[in-house]
């Protein structure tokens, strides 16, 4: 029927075939970190910067 949403989403093949790029990893912590740095300055966002680093390390990035 037209107008129905496909209930079978495409499998996440991109992560299986291509390695995750640092720019695409941890989008939640990256967004929070970047917003804090822009609004308050890097010196006030250490906890968010560290949280993003921990997330990146958990995904295998060496930071």
From Swiss-Prot:
It holds the Pfam family COX17. Acetylation by KAT8 promotes assembly of the mitochondrial respiratory chain complex IV (CIV). InterPro entries: Cys_alpha_HP_mot_SF, Cyt_c_oxidase_Cu-chaperone. Belongs to the COX17 family. One of its GO terms (cellular component) is mitochondrial intermembrane space. The keyword Secreted does not apply. Disulfide bonds join 26-55, 36-45. The modification N6-acetyllysine is found at residues 18, 30. GO terms for molecular function: copper chaperone activity; copper ion binding; cuprous ion binding; enzyme activator activity. Residues 23-63 form the CHCH domain. Cu cation binds at residues 23-24. Residues 1-20 are annotated as: Disordered. Keywords: Acetylation, Chaperone, Copper, Cytoplasm, Disulfide bond, Metal-binding, Mitochondrion, Phosphoprotein. It is found in: Mitochondrion intermembrane space; Cytoplasm. It comes from the Eukaryota. Copper metallochaperone essential for the assembly of the mitochondrial respiratory chain complex IV (CIV), also known as cytochrome c oxidase. Binds two copper ions and delivers them to the metallochaperone SCO1 which transports the copper ions to the Cu(A) site on the cytochrome c oxidase subunit II (MT-CO2/COX2). A motif (Cx9C motif 2) lies at residues 45-55. The modification Phosphoserine is found at residue 14. This is Cytochrome c oxidase copper chaperone. The keyword Amino-acid biosynthesis does not apply. One of its GO terms (biological process) is positive regulation of cytochrome-c oxidase activity. Ubiquitous. Interacts with COA1. Interacts with the chaperone CHCHD4; this is important for correct folding and the formation of disulfide bonds that stabilize the structure.
